[in-house]
């Protein structure tokens, strides 16, 4: 694999878990606002948080308001540059094709996700967008960090929505399928 030098990061499992917990907090905020609970954090090479985001599609009525996009936008503003070289993005759910493409364009070094998205996962599950040799940039991928916590958050959110039957038709279109959910029951975020 042709991984750029700036992507060869040395991060411990404990550091990954610490930052993933912050992404989980963002996901909880999304759920509290009525959005699918997905959260993201962008961390620079020195360990500073430069961007935070959470799913805000319902709040903003914007199909591009995914957690990763929100976090990358904030990181670019914070750094004053669209190239986010040397950064790691922590996200609770595997990025979709749109977000994976944005992460390539932002030149992130590494993507760490909590659980796979079997319907739209684009960095491991269906595609490996961040590792395509044909693209102008590649990034490292690490999955299943705090997997149980990330899956639990999604399951809990959708269980409540099912019980309340609020937006039942929309629910079937919004729920991501993780590798432990019924694939007939859960479309993508």
What are these regions (language model features)?
Residues 1-30, 49, 95-98, 102-189:
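Zinc-dependent deaminase
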Residues 38-47:
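Short beta-strand scaffold segments in enzyme catalytic cores
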């Amino acid at each position: 694999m042709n991984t750029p030098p700036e992507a060869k990061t040395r991060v411990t499992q404990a550091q990954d878990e610490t930052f993933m917990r912050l992404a989980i907090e963002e996901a909880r905020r999304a759920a509290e606002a009525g959005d699918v609970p997905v959260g993201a954090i962008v961390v620079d090479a020195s360990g500073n948080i430069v961007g935070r985001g959470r799913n805000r599609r319902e709040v903003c009525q914007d199909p591009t308001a995914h957690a990763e996009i929100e976090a990358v936008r904030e990181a670019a503003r914070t750094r004053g540059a669209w190239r986010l070289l040397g950064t790691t993005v922590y996200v609770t759910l595997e990025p979709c094709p749109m977000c994976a493409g944005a992460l390539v364009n932002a030149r992130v070094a590494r993507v760490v996700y909590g659980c796979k998205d079997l319907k739209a996962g684009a960095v491991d599950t269906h595609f490996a967008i961040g590792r395509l040799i044909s693209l102008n940039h590649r990034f490292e991928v690490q999955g299943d960090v705090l997997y149980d916590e990330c899956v639990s958050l999604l399951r809990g959110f959708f269980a409540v929505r099912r019980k309340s039957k609020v937006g039942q038709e929309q629910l079937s279109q919004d729920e991501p399928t993780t590798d432990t959910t019924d694939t007939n029951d859960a479309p993508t975020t």
